[in-house]
């Protein structure tokens, strides 16, 4: 069954999601896009991307449509989710990627408009469930879970790492630092922002800031509630990030044992295709366009006094996340 999807918000994640489903060849039809920009701009930004390059498809537009390789997509421009006629358009699932309507009370307006499910491409509030693919998708209940969060890109990276460590060795506690590419929530030049550090020029500074990714891991691995915390360091690259996780384990381990656990998880089981494993000396640009949620860098594993372990996972914070959003769409759509 082809899954009929509407996208609300055609920004970085909305467009990356569109490209990812084309590349995956997923059985998903984009029926409509709702975005406040004009169709000429929407089509142009889909066709040309600074990071991913030119879309390998023919793109054209009219006043209220865009056409990609002969497939015409309706373009709407509604500010209020309640005004979008998803039901009339036959949309099954809405991708809520504006970054604005992350509360359940707002997101479920899409359901009132006729959609069956809403997938929020961000951490959410009061959502029915947060799902990190490869970690807790088995907890999904189609009868009761309608507003679903795909968590954050960083949670999608750190949760698989925490899952492997906790299942194999047991986590007592841990701290995380995400070395994160700058995003549209920062300023290109110094300009007011409620976070005074994010008010500073993104391409000229290393910017310490907050992240809820470590704590949010407990939403998908509840046994880790209260055990993890962390911060973010925003750095001057447009994409390509890394999660540095330091934990105290319940038992003593060696570097080889830790790496072997990650190698096994990457090769087999729920994390195959989601967690990658590398022994190469890579840098951030090497994972641009990488579909993994996390590429585990085995050469950087450190063990101190047996129980203190430091590991690092790379992730393309846009592309990897968007690929998981496609996976989640297929997962939920196949159970409609």
From Swiss-Prot:
Resistant to pentalenolactone. Pathway: Carbohydrate degradation; glycolysis; pyruvate from D-glyceraldehyde 3-phosphate: step 1/5. Catalyzes the oxidative phosphorylation of glyceraldehyde 3-phosphate (G3P) to 1,3-bisphosphoglycerate (BPG) using the cofactor NAD. The first reaction step involves the formation of a hemiacetal intermediate between G3P and a cysteine residue, and this hemiacetal intermediate is then oxidized to a thioester, with concomitant reduction of NAD to NADH. The reduced NADH is then exchanged with the second NAD, and the thioester is attacked by a nucleophilic inorganic phosphate to produce BPG. Its main location: cytoplasm. It is found in: Cytoplasm. The gene is gap. It is an enzyme of class 1 (oxidoreductase). Homotetramer. The keyword Metal-binding does not apply. It catalyses: D-glyceraldehyde 3-phosphate + phosphate + NAD(+) = (2R)-3-phospho-glyceroyl phosphate + NADH + H(+). Gene3D superfamilies: Dihydrodipicolinate Reductase, domain 2, NAD(P)-binding Rossmann-like Domain. Its EC number is 1.2.1.12. This is Glyceraldehyde-3-phosphate dehydrogenase. GO terms for cellular component: cytoplasm. Keywords: Cytoplasm, Glycolysis, NAD, Nucleotide-binding, Oxidoreductase. NAD(+) binds at residues 12-13, 35, 79, 121, 184, 317. Belongs to the glyceraldehyde-3-phosphate dehydrogenase family. One of its GO terms (biological process) is glucose metabolic process. Coiled coil: none annotated. Pfam families: Gp_dh_C, Gp_dh_N. The active site is at residue 153. GO terms for molecular function: glyceraldehyde-3-phosphate dehydrogenase (NAD+) (phosphorylating) activity; NAD binding; NADP binding. It comes from the Bacteria.
